[in-house]
């Protein structure tokens, strides 16, 4: 399939190509090449990341334009994942964290996204779906506390100083290897298939950190766990639009 994935400056304000007024310093003038690509190409889906104070109209302007030129397109919004910046006061150490903290943060994010998606669903039935990366990351936190991620040494490098952490900073950028989990969640949602069914070796690039150099890749065991977590997150989130009633790893 052919997919339109927004770069971060477009994610910050999804309707930026339709508005000439700058609202953030990161935004340049509208990029007509994106509208041209949509209007002249054949596309299957558009994907976004969320941002603060999102509104349905920020997305509907894109959806309307896309459906005008590609009526069969579907639309996907990643729900990102919990961030320590949501906590007030911020944690002083990982002793202040536990699974329940992340479950609570995830539910707070879900509530906001649910309202947004339901509003869009009323206008575009069965067209808008959530990519539940947040749910998957909470499941990863659960696996960590259960001792199922022995290669991972902490929850957040910002608190622990450990290189191999689930997150690497207060904002919530992923730790080494967890981009695979994010990718598997995207795959599972869009293709409605469990990543466990992916055959053969995936030629992942090695992780090179600007300060730390080449980092260890996730083991095959950790990679397989990521695939299972991704599918579990997707089929258990009703906003993903993916069901697996017979549990064969193929969306119904």
Q: What are the functions of these language-model segments?
A:
Residues 44-49, 74-79, 129-132:
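Structural recognition of the beta-strand scaffold that forms the well-ordered cores
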Residues 111-164, 183-194:
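Extracellular serine-dependent O-acyl
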Residues 154-252:
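Conserved catalytic region of serine esterases and O-acyltransferases that act on ester linkages
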Residues 2-5, 50-56, 80-85, 135-139, ...:
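Solvent-exposed loop/turn segments at secondary-structure junctions
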Residues 1-65:
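Conserved SGNH/GDSL esterase-like catalytic core that processes O-acyl groups on lipids
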């Amino acid at each position: 399939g052919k997919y339109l994935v927004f770069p971060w400056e477009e994610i910050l304000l999804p309707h930026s190509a339709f508005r000439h007024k700058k609202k953030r310093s990161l935004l340049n003038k509208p990029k007509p090449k994106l509208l041209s690509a949509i209007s002249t190409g054949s596309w299957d889906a558009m994907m976004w990341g969320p941002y603060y104070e999102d509104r349905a109209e920020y997305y509907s302007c894109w959806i309307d334009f896309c459906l005008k030129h590609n009526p069969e397109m579907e639309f996907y919004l990643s729900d990102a994942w919990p961030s320590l910046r949501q906590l007030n006061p911020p944690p002083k150490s990982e002793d202040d964290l536990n699974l329940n903290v992340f479950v609570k943060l995830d539910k707070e994010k879900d509530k906001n996204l649910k309202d947004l998606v339901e509003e869009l669903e009323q206008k575009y039935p069965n067209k808008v779906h959530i990519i539940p990366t947040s749910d998957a990351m909470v499941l990863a936190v659960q696996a960590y506390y259960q001792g199922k991620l022995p290669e991972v040494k902490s929850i957040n490098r910002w608190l622990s100083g450990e290189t191999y952490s689930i997150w690497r900073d207060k904002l919530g950028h992923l730790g080494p290897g967890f981009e695979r989990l994010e990718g598997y969640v995207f795959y599972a949602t869009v293709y409605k298939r469990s990543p466990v069914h992916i055959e053969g070796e995936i030629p992942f690039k090695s992780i090179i950190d600007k300060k730390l150099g080449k980092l260890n890749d996730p083991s095959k065991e950790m990679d397989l766990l990521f695939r299972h977590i991704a599918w579990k997150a997707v089929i258990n989130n009703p906003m993903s639009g993916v069901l697996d009633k017979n549990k064969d790893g193929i969306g119904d």
